[in-house]
Structures are given as C-alpha cells and as structure tokens.
C-alpha cells in the first residue's frame, strides 16, 4: 500500500460559505502531478489528544500543486490547520 504525508491547508471555501467537513490537503510528494493516484484513498489525522479523524480523498483541487480535497467525518477542528495527515492509497499494489 502506498502512503503519503500531507499538510492541512484549511477548509474548502466559497465566497460566502465555508465547508468544515472538506479539508484541503497538500500532499508532500516528489512529483505533485501524482496526487491524482490518491483519489478515493483514506486519510487519517491524529490530534495531540490522541483523537483520530478519518476521511476520504474526494478529488484534486487545481491542476497542479498536489492539493486534494478530503472529506472528514467528523469534521476536522480549526486547530488542525497546518497539521500532518497520513494518506493511504486505495486499491491494490498500484
């Protein structure tokens, strides 16, 4: 199973709306264009109290740069911004 680490950039936002259940995560990859391989993968965030937040990678955010949209349930707290996320690629060996 391929794993990648990422950094939480913040919530997905519109002009007047914020979507706290959707987090933008920048994957720390050698080639940012490979971020698409992690779509439908599972993401984990652990806070300093030991709580684990689990989410699914929904789609890419932008054309390049390695940013993906992850839907967490329950939503990430605001303090997670800048925190580290572990992403596991879905599927087989790939």
Curated annotation (Swiss-Prot):
Entry-linked Pfam families: Ribosomal_L35Ae
Gene Ontology MF term list: structural constituent of ribosome
Xref: InterPro entries: Ribosomal_eL33, Ribosomal_eL33_sf, Transl_B-barrel_sf
GO cellular component: ribonucleoprotein complex; ribosome
GO BP: translation
Domain of life: Archaea
The family this protein is said to belong to: Belongs to the eukaryotic ribosomal protein eL33 family.
Protein name: Large ribosomal subunit protein eL33
Gene that specifies this protein: rpl35ae
